[in-house]
């Protein structure tokens, strides 16, 4: 579960390394986000030659969560870190590569490009 003001790692090559959560999208009372949810973030750390710069406000989708998710078949998937991929308004990633594994639930939520770029889908 990711709350507002949480710091997250960035799992793509858009230039950002760490982001801070400003807002969880999906309703006025929604306070937490999990895998597949869209959040609005501020870039806290970035490389100087990247697409996004420090201080920029971007949209991102959560691809890994320490809290984990419960599947209908009884599996519980949990990751080692909280990570996001920075996206455009049409659900496509701003970077051209995705680092690390991503959850299969992203395919159900319409992020097919992120799933196809990921080296491993769990």
UniProtKB/Swiss-Prot annotation:
UniProt entry keywords in alphabetical sequence: Ribonucleoprotein, Ribosomal protein, RNA-binding, rRNA-binding
InterPro entries: Ribosomal_uL14 (IPR000218), Ribosomal_uL14_bac-type (IPR005745), Ribosomal_uL14_CS (IPR019972), Ribosomal_uL14_sf (IPR036853)
Record CDD domains: Ribosomal_uL14 (cd00337)
A GO cellular-component term linked to this record: cytosolic large ribosomal subunit
GO molecular function: large ribosomal subunit rRNA binding; structural constituent of ribosome
GO terms under biological process: translation
Gene3D superfamilies: Ribosomal protein L14
Highest taxon, organism lineage: Bacteria
Family: Belongs to the universal ribosomal protein uL14 family.
Role, per record: Binds to 23S rRNA. Forms part of two intersubunit bridges in the 70S ribosome.
Assembly information from the UniProt record: Part of the 50S ribosomal subunit. Forms a cluster with proteins L3 and L19. In the 70S ribosome, L14 and L19 interact and together make contacts with the 16S rRNA in bridges B5 and B8.
Name of the protein this chain belongs to: Large ribosomal subunit protein uL14
Name of the gene this protein is made from: rplN
């Amino acid at each position: 579960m990711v709350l507002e003001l949480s710091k997250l790692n960035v799992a793509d090559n858009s230039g950002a390394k760490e982001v801070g959560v400003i807002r969880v999208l999906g309703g006025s009372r929604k306070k937490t986000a999990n895998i597949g949810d869209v959040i609005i973030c501020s870039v806290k750390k970035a490389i100087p030659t990247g697409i996004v710069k420090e201080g920029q406000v971007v949209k991102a989708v959560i691809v890994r969560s320490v809290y984990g998710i419960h599947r209908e078949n009884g599996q519980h998937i949990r990751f080692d870190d909280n990570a996001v991929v920075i996206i455009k308004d049409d659900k496509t990633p701003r970077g051209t590569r995705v680092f690390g594994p991503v959850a299969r639930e992203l395919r159900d939520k319409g992020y097919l490009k992120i799933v196809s770029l990921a080296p491993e889908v769990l």
